[in-house]
Amino acid sequence: MDFTQDHFALFGLPRRYALDNAELDRLYREVQARVHPDKFAHQPDAERRLAMQWATRINEAYQTLRQPLSRAKYLLSLSGVEVERERRMSAEFLMQQMEWREAVAEARAALAVDELEALHARLKKEMREQYLKLAAQLDAPDVGAAADLLRQLMFQEKLLAEIDDALAAAEA
């Protein structure tokens, strides 16, 4: 195994956004079994340390590829785009975000579970569509558009978590 391989190469996968999670899970277990530190328990210290480094590297790669948002960020980073550094968003999207946040705040204050659930469903639907669009942009690749859409999805994932928190608080 080669430490310079990207996450996709570690698992023998093509470098693309669309992945079969069941296949990724299978490959993870297969690769992890080859380098698991327990297999090296009776080996010299250097080999045990190397096995631990490999296990850590494989776990990190798996966690990155398993999550759609982190997989998209990683793909863009392989193209030289660091999404976290750039913060520009369209005025239209920022207005939409403000409207969403106001609606969540009002529903949270009123403990309106039905309203929060409706907001959650609408946001999830919109995000599903955006994830499909993101996949096409990443596989094209249209890294500029993909980076913009990924930044929007990062905001929306945070908002979704806020709605989940508000629902938990309202139902408690």
Identify the residue ranges that each predicted region occupies:
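C-terminal accessory/regulatory regions appended to core domains
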Residues: 1-172
